[in-house]
Amino acid sequence: MSDSLRIVFAGTPDFAARHLEALLMSQHEVVGVLTRPDKPAGRGKKLTPSPVKVLAEERNITVFQPATLRSEENQQWVLKQQPDVLIVVAYGLILPKVVLNIPELGCLNVHGSLLPRWRGAAPIQRSLWAGDTETGVTIMQMDIGLDTGDMLYKARCPITPEDTSASLYEKLANIGPDALLKTLSLITSGKSQPETQNENLVTYAEKLSKEEARINWELSATHLERCIRAFNPWPMSFFEMEGQPIKVWKAEAIEEQTSVEPGTVLKADKEGIYIATADGILNITQLQPAGKKAMSAANLLNSKREWFTPGNKIN
């Protein structure tokens, strides 16, 4: 097999663009790019191209932006590119079986977890939410299931107690491209050894919702602190004061028991706002009132100390 593969790349956000960049700098030939249609963005709701489209057009690569790949006409576009392999990174559209079967080497996916743990839509966030100490990327052969295909390569990285979804996303965006290129080298040299996923180890990374981000004081402080990091930068953990959402950017869990009702303010000072939970105390150190920028707890107390009088109950 030739060392240089004809690749159709399918991806949309910056995470995907990092992988496309690595392919463009390699010996392989990217013959076409699939990405989601331009979307309204910003206050002016101006139609904005995806980071993948911007990069592809800078490099004069053919870009196709179908709303679906279920139509025969759109499938013909993929066929006409005559790819050896189709590489999917955070694309956002389902690839029907007929598309999966077009390239001789099938379709590869870069997935943001160590499969079979965290199949599904939000693997980066769920690894933080669950308190995992390690994650990574898996390069897998795609089939018609949801992240069920054989695994070809894994790259690992530790999760630190300071990591948020934003920082973990950045870590995986840094290790994923190299893992992808190594996988392609294994394939072209005939050394690839696909590994079947162990169904007994499967967990699912459900999509995040804004409602899930509402802080539930009936949970433990440790779990709430993990949620705050997992939901940063979206959808952002929050509670309400006077009907206004207050986003929480940073907090720490204190393993100290208290007999007061969960959601009760214990104290508030320049070190933070201490709130009772079902198990332990959550000290909130950085928050963002509606319509304001993120600020330290000390800054918010300068203007809204009455909100956090000890004994007050927070929704």
UniProtKB/Swiss-Prot annotation:
UniProt binding sites for (6S)-5,6,7,8-tetrahydrofolate: 113-116
Gene: fmt
InterPro entries documented for this protein: Fmt, Formyl_trans_C, Formyl_trans_C_sf, Formyl_transf_N, Formyl_transf_N_sf, Formyl_transferase-like_C_sf, GART_AS, Met-tRNA-FMT_C
Lineage, uppermost ranks: Bacteria, Pseudomonadati, Pseudomonadota, Gammaproteobacteria, Enterobacterales
Entry's Gene Ontology molecular function annotations: methionyl-tRNA formyltransferase activity
Listed NCBIfam families: fmt (TIGR00460)
Entry protein name: Methionyl-tRNA formyltransferase
Keywords noted in UniProt: Protein biosynthesis, Transferase
Gene Ontology CC annotation, any one: cytosol
SUPFAM superfamilies referenced in this protein's UniProt entry, alphabetically: FMT C-terminal domain-like, Formyltransferase
Alphabetical list of Gene3D superfamilies matching this protein: Formyl transferase, C-terminal domain, Formyl transferase, N-terminal domain
HAMAP family membership: Formyl_trans (MF_00182)
The reaction(s) this protein catalyses: L-methionyl-tRNA(fMet) + (6R)-10-formyltetrahydrofolate = N-formyl-L-methionyl-tRNA(fMet) + (6S)-5,6,7,8-tetrahydrofolate + H(+)
Similarity comment: family membership: Belongs to the Fmt family.
EC nos: 2.1.2.9
Job description of the protein: Attaches a formyl group to the free amino group of methionyl-tRNA(fMet). The formyl group appears to play a dual role in the initiator identity of N-formylmethionyl-tRNA by promoting its recognition by IF2 and preventing the misappropriation of this tRNA by the elongation apparatus.
